[in-house]
Regions:
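Active-/binding-site microenvironments in catalytic and ligand-binding cores
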Residues: 1-214
Length: 214
């Protein structure tokens, strides 16, 4: 199982058999991989400003142990609340990263399956992404809240809307424990973010080791 990874903008998740810019599944099958919009398009790496949204700061969201329980959604209005709490403002080109305490919970309680769920972004966050011009989105979990609250036919609403509809790449399963500790000490939730995926021709994604530089 791949831990921290970056999805390719095309081919990774599709909606009704089509990816970004309407690319049909048949094109991918014929190419034996992702012919365009693959992970190799980001071979020179990603360097941009990051905003770390600490969901445990939201009133009523976190447990006493310091994490957000699986299945808890973080909505668009929650991000707007966190902007005020953290004294930040998301701007075009930013990557937004959501801390739910997933790895802290795992360290204390052990692993759990997808059937238990994960905290993450609700589908209405897509409006926030579009309005703010966000370039990348990520989380310490699979990014989408699970269960999503949407019909099963939709699957992963944030993945489908961000990747297939808007061309916004997604970082999944990142470990923010050290970053969030530093952010709390400094009371600063923005930093320089750097990540370089592997050069995988036709690849639909890549493992990576991103860096937060305060």
């Amino acid at each position: 199982v791949v831990h921290s990874h970056l999805d390719a903008v095309d081919c990774h998740v599709m909606y009704q058999g089509k990816g970004y810019n309407g690319r049909p599944m048949e094109d991918i099958k014929a190419a034996g991989g992702c012919p365009k919009g693959n992970i190799d398009a980001l071979k020179d790496g990603v360097v941009t400003r990051a905003i770390l949204f600490d969901a445990t700061l939201l009133p009523g969201k976190a447990t006493a142990q310091g994490w957000v329980e699986p299945g808890t959604p973080v909505h668009r209005e929650d991000l707007e609340t966190l902007e005020k709490m953290e004294h930040v403002k998301v701007a075009p080109g930013d990557v937004i990263l959501l801390y739910t305490g997933r790895w802290k919970r795992r360290a204390e309680k052990g692993p759990w399956g997808r059937d238990t769920g994960f905290a993450g972004y609700h589908g209405d966050v897509a409006y926030f992404l579009k309005e703010r011009g966000v370039s990348f989105i990520g989380s310490d979990g699979p990014t989408d809240v699970m269960p999503s609250g949407f019909p099963a036919s939709v699957g992963l609403p944030i993945h489908q809307l961000a990747l297939a509809a808007m061309g916004i790449d997604i970082f999944d399963n990142l470990d923010f424990e050290r970053a969030v500790e530093h952010a709390r000490q400094l009371n600063r939730y923005e930093f320089l973010f750097s990540a370089a995926p592997l050069r995988i021709a036709l690849g639909t994604g890549s493992p990576l080791n991103p860096l937060a530089i305060f």
